[in-house]
A protein has these predicted regions:
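Active-site neighborhood of phospho(di)ester-bond hydrolases with catalytic His/Asp-centered motifs
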Residues: 26-27, 47-56, 74-79, 106-109, ...
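Conserved beta-strand hairpin/beta-sheet module of binuclear metal-dependent hydrolase folds
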Residues: 1-46, 117-132, 138
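Divalent metal-coordination and catalytic microenvironments
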Residues: 18, 28, 54, 66, ...
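Active-site metal-binding loops of divalent metal-dependent hydrolases
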Residues: 29-30, 55, 79, 111, ...
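Active-site metal-binding motif and surrounding structural segment of the metallo-beta-lactamase
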Residues: 33-75
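Core dinuclear metal-dependent hydrolase active-site scaffold
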Residues: 2-6, 16-19, 95-124, 128-129, ...
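Metallo-beta-lactamase
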Residues: 111-230
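Rhodanese-like catalytic fold shared by cysteine-dependent sulfurtransferases
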Residues: 142-144, 155, 202-239, 243, ...
Length: 469
């Protein structure tokens, strides 16, 4: 028996490859499915099943592509309603895989079709459970994350989830392993642990959903308190996962269209496309195409694109190192952004060589900022998450989380003297680029973010505030 967790940090997502005696299964695969096919080829195994724990909101699953390429059977749990051929399993239905079995455990609450899969070894002993977005390490899945079930309240879903966790998962043996669908950083939970596998026994001690510390009513209140709004692209991803999507190879082929620097702006204007710059924040700050948006490929790239661009159909033109074009298109496609219509030929170097117009981000060191921070006209915007802000922040700073920047709900004024920072510089440059594209030209970025600010003489709050965000 072989179990391999394939964890993608950018999405904080775990897919699973399971193999026994020449037969294999994949649970919650990503859209770029070659990695699973290669694993099966290594041992001359056949992928027999693709198990889906639910209709995912935060990424596009590779279930359809994998099934088409391997003739594997797609399997969902009860209540799933896909628009394509799939086996809708019954609760407690058993699937044979070589010498092992996987048993369907319907565990609704995160969504109504949410399902876990219990693996038993060749001796019939419970070995592990794949919990999808039902049970995370240290947490559970947020109910109704894609706002899909308008007829069921978040409180009702939370109550259903409580029963699923306590009646279906908690009675299982302490020594079995828990393999969740996500880890820390995912928008599908609140307070997940950084670890990606644990024993159920340890979770029964540490996880508030399992340790008996909360009544059902209190569990519902805690889970539904301060629920963040789901990113606006989540419902689109659910729809794609339920109804179907283009094969990734088609998306890549469509996106790999080299566009000369002389035609790049006109193409963006004609197609109403966003010019997305994927280089480092340092390089972007030094020079970039006017009105382009920075979201660096080496940060939390795909989720930030989804949360900030919102519309999965939005045409996108890429500015990225030539050798990373296919990687960029693939990572965008993982979150449903399939409409890449081209990239800047030869990268940003060609723009510089053509001596075309550039824009820059104004910056200031934390040390230099310390000399003006107390001036009355200075406006300080901290674009970190509320939990980060309430832990520690510059005195008199205003918290505007990055995801709230595009709509300018806080009515940032164009004539204010704005100084902006995040934790290390990645998010604040994103925010700066978005506002700059909207006509804000008076924003100065504090280099190094809060980590540099803490090392300076700038006054910050002297408390650490626990948070449930």
């Amino acid at each position: 028996m072989k179990i391999e967790q394939l964890y993608t940090k950018c999405l904080a997502q775990g897919a699973y490859y399971i193999e026994s005696n020449g037969e294999a299964a994949v649970i919650d695969p990503l859209r770029d499915v070659k990695q699973y096919i290669d694993l099966a080829k290594e041992s001359n195994s056949k992928i027999k099943y693709v198990f889906e724990t639910h209709f995912h909101a935060d990424f596009i699953s590779g279930h359809l592509s994998l099934a088409n390429l391997t003739e594997a059977q797609i399997v969902y749990g009860p209540k799933a309603d896909p628009d394509y051929e799939a086996l809708i399993a019954k609760d407690k239905q058993v699937f044979n895989l070589g010498e092992i079995t996987l048993t369907v455990l319907h565990t609704p609450g995160h969504t109504l079709e949410s399902t876990s899969f219990l693996l038993k070894d060749k001796n019939g002993k419970e070995h592990c459970i794949f919990t999808g977005d039902t049970l995370f390490l240290g947490d559970v899945g947020i109910p109704d994350v894609a706002q899909r079930y308008m007829g069921v309240s978040k409180e009702e879903l939370a109550g259903i989830l409580y029963d699923s966790v306590n009646l279906k998962i908690k009675p299982l043996p302490d020594n079995i392993l828990v393999y969740p669908g996500h880890g820390a950083g995912s928008a599908c939970g609140k307070n997940m642990m950084k670890e990606t596998v644990d024993t159920l026994g340890n979770q029964k001690k540490m996880n508030y959903a399992l340790n008996g510390s909360l009544s059902k009513d209190n569990f519902i209140k805690q889970l539904t308190n301060n629920l963040p709004e789901p990113p606006t692209y989540f419902p689109s991803n659910v729809k794609l996962n339920q109804q179907g999507y283009q094969d990734l190879s088609v998306v890549i082929e469509n996106g790999k269209q080299a566009i000369s620097c002389n035609d790049f702006i006109s193409k963006a204007t004609a197609e109403n496309a966003v010019m997305l710059d994927l280089r480092s924040q340092i390089d972007f700050a030094k020079a970039h195409i006017p009105n382009s948006i920075f979201i660096g490929i080496d940060g939390g790239f795909a989720p930030w694109v989804g949360g900030l661009l919102k519309n999965v159909a939005k045409p996108i033109l890429l500015i990225v190192e030539p050798e990373r074009i296919e990687e960029a298109i693939t990572r965008l496609a993982r979150v449903g952004f399939d409409n890449v219509i081209g990239y800047l030929d030869e990268g940003f170097d060609s723009w510089i060589e053509a001596n075309l117009k550039i824009a820059k981000i104004s910056t200031i060191s934390a040390q230099d900022f310390s000399e003006i921070v107390d001036k009355k006209e200075v406006k300080i915007y901290d674009v970190r998450k509320p939990s980060e802000f309430f832990s520690e922040h510059i005195i008199n700073a205003i918290n505007i989380p990055l995801l709230e920047i595009p709509d300018n709900k806080h009515e940032i004024q164009k004539d204010d003297n704005i100084y902006m920072h995040c934790a290390g510089g990645y998010r604040s440059i994103i925010a700066n680029s978005i506002l700059k594209s909207k006509g804000f030209h008076n924003i100065i970025d504090i280099v190094g973010g809060f980590s540099s600010i803490k090392d300076s003489s700038i006054k910050i709050t002297d408390y650490i505030c626990p948070s449930e965000f």
